[in-house]
C-alpha cells in the first residue's frame, strides 16, 4: 500500500498529510499529523437524496483512549457513549463546514475525524476542522472551501498561534477562528474579561493564519491533480415561487408589519396564509401544473413559502430598518429578572426573561468529592464547575418524547459554562463544587445567553462570591449584496431566517465567551468587529437590569447547603493525616461526622452541615500536622496507661509518651500511683527521637502552666446528602 505524503510548514511547525492510503472506500480521506498528534479524517457522500429542506450533514469526532496510551475505565474497559469533549469537537467541525456546502444540496454527507494519537502540545480539535475541509476536497464533494481553523492564545501581551494545553490554561484567551476564502465562518472563544479591542485583534491575527492554510490546501489539490468541485444549483421550476410571490406577498408583508402582535399570533397568521394558498391550489383542476407539483412533493409549498417569508422579512430590515416586533436594529427586548424564587432547599435560584425567552437557573453547592472526573483525552482530570442546559419541548409549544441531552443542549451548556468560569472564586476562597442547571421554560431566541444571565443571578443567590456579574446577548446579521444590517438581541425568526448567530458574553470589564455561526460563506473581520462593539451597550443594559434583582452574593448560604472549611497543610504530612490504611482520617470523620478531602497539593477541605463539627475536624488535623518542638509545654489528657508509662494527647490527634521515670522527681513503682486514664496533666516535650516519637516529662513542670485545648466531644450533625 502506498499513499502520497505532503507537508505544510506552518508557524514553524510541520503539518504532515498522507492521502490515498487510508479508508479507500470513503470519498476522501487524509491522515493529518502535527507533532505526535495524528487524526484520520474521512468524508463520505451517498447518492441517496433526502426529501428535506436542510442538508443531512453528520460530523463525528471520535477519540479512543489508546491515543494517549490509556485503557478505559468501567467494567467493559471499552469506550462507550462519546464524552462531552468529543461532542463539542464534533460541533466545532460541523459549524464551519455546514455553510460551505451548496444550499441546494440534499445528499447525505458524513465527516468522521478519529484521533489516533494525541500530543499534549498539539490539541486535536483545530487539526480535525482543517482535516475535514481537506477530506471533503479530496472526495470531490461540492464545497465552497477550502476552509481552515486555528487557535489563538494570549499570554501577557503576546498572541500565540495554536498554543499547547498548558499554554491555554496559563493564558487569558482561547479562541478558535475558522475561515474560508470569503471570510470568517466560525468563532468559538473563552476569555478572561478581555477587552473588545483585544478580542478583535486576536480574531484578525487568527484569520491571517487561516488564509495561509487555505492557500496550502489549494496547492495540495493542484499537486494531486484534483479539481475542486463547485457545481451550480440545479435548475428549479419557478412555477410555484412565482405563484406565491404574486398571491402571498401582500398578505405576508401585512403580517410582518404588525409590530404589536405576539410570536404566536404572527405564526398563526402566516400559517393561515399558507393553508389558504394550499386550499386554492388543491381546488384547481387535476391536470393543473401547480396541483401536480404539490402532489409529487408535499413539502414543496412549505419550503417555498418559507423562502418568500425570509425574503420579505430581510427586505423589511434592509429597506425600512424595522424588525418584525417593531424594535430598532440595536434595541434589546424587555427584560425581567428575579433571584431566590425557590425555597432554600435549592441553594440558589433565579428566573431570567428577555422577550419570550425565559430561563430558570438553579445552583447546588457540593463538596470536593462531587467534582466530575473526566475520562477522556483532556489533560484536565476533573471539573468543579458544571453547567447543564435543558431544552424541553414545551418551551417551544411542541410535544415530543423527553430524551437525554442532545448535541445542541450539550453545546449550549458548555458555552454558558465557559462564560462564567473566569469570574468564579478560587478554591481556597470558596472550595465548593458548583452545579448550575438552566431550564429553558420558553424559547424565542438566545436561550444560551439567557442561561448565562440566569446562572449569574442563581450563583449570587447561592452566596457564591463572583468576581463580577456576567451577561450575554446574541447578535444577528442580514446581508443582501453589499447591504449589511447588524441586529442586537435576535429572536427566533431572525435567527432562523438571518445569516448569523453571534453570541457575546462578558462582564462590564470585558468579554468572557464568544460563539459565532454563519449561514453564508464568510464575513470580513471589520463586520465582525462592528458586531462585537455593538454587543457591548446591549450587555451593559442587561447587566443593569440583572443588578436590580441582585447585585452581590447573599451574605449567608442556604441552611441546607454543606459547610466547608478549607486550609493548607504541608503536602509531606498528608500521609500523617490519612494514617495506615486510612485509619486516621476515617477516625476523624467518624468522630466529627464530617467529610474530608485532601488534594495532592495539601489543600484540605472539610464538609459538614454543622460548622462546629467542621471546626473540630480542622483542629484535629492541624494538631496532627503541627510541628512540636523540644521544650514546649502542653496541657493534655492521659489517653492510655502501659506498664512503662502513660500516653498523653498534647494536640488533637497527636500523642507523646511519659516514661514512668519522668512522672515524678521521686521513684514511681506503678504508673497508676501518679496518673490515671482521663487525667489532665501538664507536660514538657523532653525530646523527639529519630523516628519522630515524642517523649514527654512531668518532672520540673508546674501543673496547669502549659498550652491547653478543650477536650473535643462528638457533635451530632445531619448526614451529608
Curated annotation (Swiss-Prot):
Pfam families: KH_1, PNPase, RNase_PH, RNase_PH_C, S1. Mg(2+) binds at residues 495, 501. PROSITE patterns: KH_TYPE_1, S1. Residues 631-699 form the S1 motif domain. Keywords: Cytoplasm, Magnesium, Metal-binding, Nucleotidyltransferase, RNA-binding, Transferase. GO terms for molecular function: 3'-5'-RNA exonuclease activity; magnesium ion binding; polyribonucleotide nucleotidyltransferase activity; RNA binding. Disulfide bonds: none annotated. It is found in: Cytoplasm. This is Polyribonucleotide nucleotidyltransferase. It comes from Prochlorococcus marinus (strain MIT 9312). The gene is pnp.
Amino acid at each position: 500500500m502506498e499513499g502520497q505524503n505532503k507537508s505544510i510548514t506552518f508557524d514553524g511547525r510541520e503539518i504532515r498529510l498522507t492521502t490515498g492510503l487510508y479508508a479507500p472506500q470513503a470519498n476522501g480521506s487524509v491522515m493529518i499529523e502535527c507533532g505526535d498528534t495524528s487524526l484520520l479524517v474521512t468524508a463520505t457522500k451517498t447518492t441517496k437524496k433526502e426529501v428535506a429542506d436542510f442538508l443531512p450533514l453528520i460530523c463525528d469526532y471520535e477519540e479512543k483512549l489508546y491515543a494517549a496510551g490509556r485503557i478505559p475505565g468501567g467494567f467493559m474497559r471499552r469506550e462507550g457513549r462519546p464524552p462531552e469533549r468529543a461532542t463539542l469537537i464534533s460541533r466545532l467541525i460541523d459549524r464551519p463546514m455546514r455553510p460551505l456546502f451548496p444550499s441546494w444540496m440534499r445528499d447525505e454527507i458524513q465527516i468522521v475525524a478519529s484521533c489516533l494519537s494525541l500530543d499534549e502540545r498539539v490539541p486535536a480539535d483545530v487539526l480535525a476542522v482543517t482535516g475535514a475541509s481537506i477530506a471533503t476536497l479530496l472526495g470531490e464533494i461540492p464545497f465552497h472551501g477550502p476552509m481552515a481553523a486555528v487557535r489563538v492564545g494570549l499570554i501577557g501581551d503576546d498572541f500565540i498561534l495554536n498554543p499547547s494545553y498548558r499554554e491555554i490554561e496559563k493564558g487569558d484567551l482561547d479562541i478558535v477562528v475558522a475561515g474560508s476564502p470569503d471570510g470568517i465562518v466560525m468563532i468559538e472563544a473563552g476569555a478572561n474579561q478581555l477587552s473588545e479591542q483585544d478580542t478583535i485583534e486576536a480574531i484578525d491575527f487568527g484569520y491571517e493564519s487561516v488564509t495561509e492554510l487555505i492557500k496550502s490546501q489549494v496547492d495540495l489539490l493542484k499537486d494531486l491533480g484534483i479539481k475542486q468541485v463547485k457545481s451550480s444549483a440545479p435548475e428549479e421550476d419557478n412555477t410555484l415561487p412565482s405563484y406565491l410571490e404574486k398571491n402571498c406577498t401582500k398578505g405576508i408583508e401585512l403580517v410582518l408589519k404588525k409590530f404589536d402582535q405576539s410570536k404566536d399570533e404572527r405564526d398563526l397568521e402566516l400559517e393561515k396564509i399558507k393553508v389558504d394558498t394550499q386550499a386554492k391550489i388543491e381546488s384547481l383542476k387535476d391536470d393543473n401544473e401547480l396541483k401536480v407539483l404539490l402532489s409529487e412533493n408535499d413539502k414543496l409549498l412549505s419550503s417555498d413559502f418559507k423562502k418568500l417569508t425570509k425574503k420579505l422579512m430581510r427586505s423589511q430590515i434592509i429597506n425600512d430598518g424595522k424588525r418584525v416586533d417593531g424594535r430598532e436594529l440595536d434595541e434589546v427586548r424587555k427584560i425581567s429578572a428575579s433571584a431566590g424564587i425557590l425555597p432554600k432547599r435549592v441553594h440558589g435560584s433565579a428566573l431570567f426573561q428577555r422577550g419570550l425567552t425565559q430561563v430558570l437557573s438553579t445552583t447546588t453547592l457540593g463538596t470536593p468529592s462531587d467534582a466530575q472526573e473526566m475520562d477522556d483525552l483532556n489533560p484536565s482530570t476533573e471539573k468543579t464547575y458544571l453547567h447543564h442546559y435543558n431544552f424541553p419541548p414545551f418551551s417551544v409549544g411542541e410535544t415530543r418524547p423527553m430524551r437525554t441531552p442532545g448535541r445542541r443542549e450539550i453545546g449550549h451548556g458548555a458555552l454558558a459554562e465557559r462564560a462564567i468560569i473566569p469570574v468564579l472564586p478560587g478554591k481556597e476562597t470558596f472550595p465548593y463544587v458548583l452545579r448550575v442547571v438552566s431550564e429553558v421554560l420558553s424559547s424565542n431566541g438566545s436561550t444560551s445567553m439567557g442561561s448565562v444571565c440566569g446562572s449569574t443571578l442563581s450563583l449570587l443567590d447561592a452566596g457564591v462570591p463572583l468576581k463580577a456579574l456576567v451577561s450575554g446577548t446574541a447578535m444577528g446579521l442580514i446581508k443582501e449584496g453589499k447591504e449589511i444590517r447588524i441586529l442586537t438581541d435576535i429572536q427566533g425568526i431572525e435567527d432562523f431566517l438571518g445569516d448569523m448567530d453571534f453570541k457575546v458574553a462578558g462582564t462590564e470589564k470585558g468579554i468572557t465567551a464568544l460563539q459565532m455561526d454563519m449561514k453564508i460563506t464568510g464575513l470580513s473581520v471589520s463586520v465582525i468587529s462592528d458586531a462585537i462593539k455593538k454587543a457591548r451597550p446591549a450587555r451593559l443594559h442587561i447587566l443593569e437590569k440583572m443588578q436590580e434583582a441582585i447585585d452581590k452574593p447573599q451574605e449567608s448560604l442556604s441552611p441546607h447547603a454543606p459547610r466547608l472549611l478549607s486550609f493548607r497543610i504541608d503536602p509531606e504530612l498528608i500521609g500523617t493525616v490519612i494514617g495506615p490504611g486510612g485509619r486516621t482520617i476515617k477516625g476523624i470523620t467518624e468522630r466529627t461526622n464530617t467529610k474530608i478531602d485532601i488534594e495532592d497539593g495539601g489543600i484540605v477541605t472539610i464538609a459538614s452541615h454543622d460548622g462546629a463539627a467542621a471546626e473540630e475536624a480542622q483542629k484535629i488535623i492541624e494538631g496532627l500536622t503541627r510541628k512540636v518542638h523540644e521544650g514546649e509545654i502542653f496541657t493534655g489528657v492521659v489517653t492510655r496507661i502501659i506498664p512503662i508509662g502513660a500516653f498523653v494527647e498534647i494536640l488533637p490527634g497527636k500523642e507523646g509518651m511519659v516514661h514512668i521515670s519522668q512522672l515524678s522527681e521521686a521513684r514511681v513503682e506503678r504508673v497508676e500511683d501518679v496518673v490515671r486514664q482521663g487525667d489532665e496533666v501538664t507536660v514538657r516535650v523532653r525530646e523527639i527521637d529519630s523516628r519522630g516519637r515524642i517523649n514527654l516529662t512531668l518532672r520540673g513542670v508546674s501543673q496547669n502552666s502549659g498550652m491547653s485545648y478543650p477536650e473535643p466531644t462528638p457533635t451530632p450533625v445531619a448526614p451529608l446528602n
